[in-house]
Amino acid sequence: PGAETKAFTSYLPDSSLLADNLTPRAAIRQYQDFFTDFDSAKAYEMVDFFRLPADRKLSAMSKGMREKLQVALIMSRNAHVYLLDEPISGVDPAARDVILRAVISRFNPQAVMLLSTHLINDVESIVSTAVFMSAGQVFLTGDADQLRSTYQTSLDGLFRGMYR
């Protein structure tokens, strides 16, 4: 990925890229310096929504709190494409709901979101198109409602059946 791609893509990796000595406030300043499309007011609003202490170091935060901060940062960019790699793995079910609610309520409908996850049941209600992959190869893709209708099961049921 080059500078052009990074200019319109907001990426959440499956592992943190933030230094443990950063605070949410410092991370917001860092993102503001790096990304011209970053909305710091939106980031602070999300930090408040997630009830994150703005001046606590990441090293003193739980995994769920760090995950929420990363989501706040990437969703505070005015990007055209959002890539979220396992955004809710490793956090408890209550935190998953909060994270997904924040993502959906703050998502620009003019943008595209690609979300990779093994937690299909948790994201099924927000998925419009599903792509099932194995060993780096696509083996099934389609409109989520059409897949449910065709296979007479949920996306989670389809996922579980295909990956046995």
What is the predicted role of each segment?
Residues 123-125:
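A short, surface-exposed alpha-helical micro-motif characterized by mixed small hydrophobic
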